[in-house]
Structures are given as structure tokens and as C-alpha cells.
Amino acid sequence: MSESFDCAKCNESLYGRKYIQTDSGPYCVPCYDNTFANTCAECQQLIGHDSRELFYEDRHFHEGCFRCCRCQRSLADEPFTCQDSELLCNDCYCSAFSSQCSACGETVMPGSRKLEYGGQTWHEHCFLCSGCEQPLGSRSFVPDKGAHYCVPCYENKFAPRCARCSKTLTQGGVTYRDQPWHRECLVCTGCQTPLAGQQFTSRDEDPYCVACFGELFAPKCSSCKRPIVGLGGGKYVSFEDRHWHHNCFSCARCSTSLVGQGFVPDGDQVLCQGCSQAGP
């Protein structure tokens, strides 16, 4: 009598039948599929032992069921993306979920490096400075009327320029004759002393500190010989081609102030009427 050779599950004889051997014993094909086969996540049917099985994460598929949920294209040996548990080929994913580059108009592919600003998207290599046309990458930039500039290009194009050196002013300038200047560029034409923050005047559009202007251009007091400068409310008296500070315009003999008083010239001197009448 021959030894029994039965299916480990249904106990039906396997003589003359196709079977599959496992560590737990032999199985007829139907029992093997019912016991060990995975269920296809798409069609919910068993994936038989003679079917090609594909799996993604914890889901299993017949080869014919592993396809794009939109265009039904097979994803076997094709790149794909999972979106909300649905499988999509790259073309459908890009069409449905990817954005277009605002510069070149091409699709920004999933996983590629991109930049987003103001509701727009760019390929990293397409986000360029509108001035030098170099990629901005992670550098600081300044938006202006739909354009984007790196900081050096923006300053070079839009920042005010110093009236003296013509270089851009990026911070802390001063205004002279309605033009911007670097603080260090606004200096006295005579002594080169910085003028920012102090009183100064000008001649022929050139700026001068008070001291240089007085020495170079101001009339000299006929009494003390020092320059007469009008800054700060200074007052002076003129007679013919001579000038005096208010506090210097006094009688040469008695030192009485002659401001607003009658006086008599006496050579290089001026006298009050009393001293003039008194004689030499």
C-alpha cells in the first residue's frame, strides 16, 4: 500500500496533481493561494502564485492593477508618485499638483529644487537677478515692480548717488543743494573739514566752513581786522569801502558805540560828534 501524500489543508490527495511545497507541508494550488496569497489593493482579488505581484509600502497589486489612477497607464517599471493614497504617473501628478515655473513656463517637477515668492514658483536655476542675471538662490533680494534684484544690483540701479563721488548711498547721507552726499564727502573746499552737523556756507556752489569762508571771502573789520561773517545773526556796519563789526564800531577816542549814532570820519578812524567837535 502506497504512503499517503495529501494537501496540508484540505487533506485531498496530491497524487497526479500540481502542488506547492512549503515549510509546513505540501499544498494544492487552490489551498496555497487561499492560505498564502496577498489580496490586490486595487481589485480585491487574490494574487495567485502564478501572477506577477507588485507592492508599494504595505499594499500589494497584480501587475495589471498597478496603474495610474487617472490615465490608467501601467506603473510597472515607471516612476510614480502617491498622492492621498492614490498612485499617479509623473505626467498626471505634474498636471494635477505641480506648479509651473514663472520664468520658463515648464513644470516644476516633484522633488526638484524650487523657490516660491508672492504666490509664484521658480526652478532654483530660473530665479535670477533682473540686473546681473545670476541665480539669487538663498541670497537676499529686493522685489521691484515684478522684477527681483540682488542687493548690489538694486543699490546700483535705484539707490541715490553721492553728488561728489557718484557712488551709491546705502545709509546715512546728507542733503546739500537738493542733492545727496555721503557724510564723509561733504567737506570744506578750503580745509577739507567734514561739514555734516555744523554750520557752513557756500560760494560758487562750493561749500566752506565758517572759518575758511571768512578768511577767504568775508570783508575784514576795519577795527579788529578779523573777518565779518553773517552766520548766527552777526551784524556789521559799512561806510564807503570800510566795514565794522557792530561791537567794533565805536569812537576811536572815547570808545562810545556809534551804532545808530551820528559819526565823523577822521582819516582811518571814526569819531563821535562830541570828540570831533572837541578838536585834536
Curated annotation (Swiss-Prot):
One of its GO terms (cellular component) is stress fiber. A zinc finger (C4-type) spans 7-31. GO terms for molecular function: actin binding; transcription coregulator activity; zinc ion binding. InterPro entries: LIM_FHL1/2/3/5_N, Znf_LIM. Expressed only in skeletal muscle. Disulfide bonds: none annotated. GO terms for biological process: actin cytoskeleton organization; muscle organ development. Keywords: Acetylation, Activator, Cytoplasm, LIM domain, Metal-binding, Nucleus, Repeat, Transcription, Transcription regulation, Zinc, Zinc-finger. It is found in: Nucleus; Cytoplasm. The modification N-acetylserine is found at residue 2. Residues 40-92, 101-153, 162-212, 221-275 form the LIM zinc-binding domain. The modification N6-acetyllysine is found at residues 157, 235. Interacts with SOX15; the interaction recruits FHL3 to FOXK1 promoters where it acts as a transcriptional coactivator of FOXK1. Recruited by SOX15 to FOXK1 promoters where it acts as a transcriptional coactivator of FOXK1. This is Four and a half LIM domains protein 3. It comes from Homo sapiens. The gene is FHL3.
